[in-house]
Structures are given as C-alpha cells and as structure tokens.
Amino acid sequence: MENISPRLESELRRVAKGPSANEKPGGIGTVRFTVRCPIGTADVLAKAKSVLEAVDNATLAGWPSNEKAAPQLPQWFIDRCAPPITQEEAERQLAWRKSLPLEEQNRLRNETDWSLDNWLYWMEPSNRQWFWWDAKVLEDYDHIALAIEVEAWPFPWGALRWLFRAAGASAVEAEE
C-alpha cells in the first residue's frame, strides 16, 4: 500500500483552508457534488469537516493497525450511525433488497443509515478512493458545492454521502 500520509496532510490543509491557488488535483481530477441542506448549511459543512479531520488525524497516528489511534469521532456522529447488525441479519437484508425493483434498491441505498463499523471500513486507507478538495456554502442557497479528488471513475462514494447525511444534509448528488 502506498504511503497515504502526504495525501492526508494535504487533505487536512484543504479541509481547513481550501486548495491553494496553484494546487492541482491528483488521480483523474475532481468530481463535483451538490449537498442539499434543509437548514443549517454552514453547520452541516462544519460537522462533516470535523469528522473527516478526526479520521485523517487518527490515520496519520497509525489507525487502523494501531487500535489505540482509533478516530476520536464527535458523539453526534456516533449517535447518528445505525446500530451494528449480525452477519445473519445483514445477509437477510441483502437478500430482501435484491428482491426489490432497481429504483427501490437505489432509494434504499441513498436513504439507509450506515453503521459506524461499515462507515469506518470505507475510511480505512486501503479502501479510500476519494479525498476532500473543496467545499463552499452557496450564499442564499440551501446547499453546498463540494469537490472531491478521485483516483478513478466510477468510485464508491457511499461513505461520503453518509458523512453529509449524518451531519444533517437531506441529499448528496453527483453533478453530471
């Protein structure tokens, strides 16, 4: 596995200050998202940043191989996550979902709360395929313009969606 530390350090800087004027994204570039927030757009953005900072700092300290460096996540995020389920229950839910029409499967994928363990799995360095690039709360709007640096397209971004939904967003949509 590549050394992810420089990438996380850059991500932490961009979370705090945005990209520098001459900075170019790595991978294949950026993918843009619209994050819809019914209320408290600035608060949603601040909450999402706080969780990502906790994960990045824990990873730089040796997580997940060093369990003592586990992310110190905000309690609101932990409380917002779904309780863990057994393997048997997960298999039963998966079989049920696969029996549904595709449109309903997609709706459930977008609306179902994630467990903390599932979310952390996708935030482990070996599973991360997206990194924060930039985000702006648009004036007089109820949404955030978000740019994410990606390695390839398509890429799994359910953990990104859950990060913002847990923070209070009503929807996260990739721009076409």
Model-derived segments and spans:
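Structured alpha/beta or helical-core interaction and ligand-binding surfaces enriched in interleaved
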Residues: 2-161, 165-169, 173-176
